[in-house]
């Protein structure tokens, strides 16, 4: 794949410029914060009790695991990151962290995350965390991202697993409840990512990453976004119907879902500056956060004690 992009020049790196902030940025803190939150909600919804200290260790391990995957992703994608406006300020591209240091950092943090999850929490949660890191790096980043138009769809498995890990950290099981949490994020990921791809289309074309708008065009992409948005609306109501959350959840999640559908439909009337795509992308982040906040606040079970 090296022929698809020009190599990044890392010859001007000055290690003394590296700061704690740079290593935090290497771990993709925005993504990591959502991973931590959804993982915590998964823990909260498990119908078992766990000591807060163990819960805290589990959250830290999930955070480190997500950061590990993010760091290794930046290491592998450093060539295309240098070509995209959206990613040109990442630490490796700016030259404040060497690529081999980023890889070592990612591997070490990932090892400790999985190890301490196994040592202090349970083996199932540790295995799921290991699988998530492996899937994000090997299946999504290395295999799918630069090869398949379905990169986001298939690769979305890793981003949807944190609440399953959190649930398993408390219950040592995988249940229907945790699978529904998984499905909400899994189905949310494609429309969220394709909205980003709509207004970053030139970037993806420039580095030859086969995102759907670049390969199939914007109209086809918008149709797919609408289809997934309808599926998301249906799946997001399931926690109420299996007794996981109360009637308040049903009403508010339904309203949020209708707004999500409105923004998805508005994409067909977007302006050349992709104003609606940007609005939809921003709302999709708010939507997922608020859905999981609702899952947390309206659940019919209590766990962490």
From Swiss-Prot:
PROSITE patterns: UBIA. It is a multi-pass membrane protein. Its main location: membrane. InterPro entries: Protohaem_IX_farnesylTrfase, UbiA_prenyltransferase, UbiA_prenylTrfase_CS, UbiA_sf. Pfam families: UbiA (PF01040). Pathway: Porphyrin-containing compound metabolism; heme O biosynthesis; heme O from protoheme: step 1/1. Its EC number is 2.5.1.141. The keyword DNA repair does not apply. Keywords: Cell inner membrane, Cell membrane, Heme biosynthesis, Membrane, Transferase, Transmembrane, Transmembrane helix. NCBIfam families: cyoE_ctaB, PRK04375.1-2. Carbon 2 of the heme B porphyrin ring is defined according to the Fischer nomenclature. Belongs to the UbiA prenyltransferase family. Protoheme IX farnesyltransferase subfamily. HAMAP family: CyoE_CtaB. This is Protoheme IX farnesyltransferase. The lineage of its organism: Bacteria, Pseudomonadati, Pseudomonadota, Alphaproteobacteria, Rickettsiales.
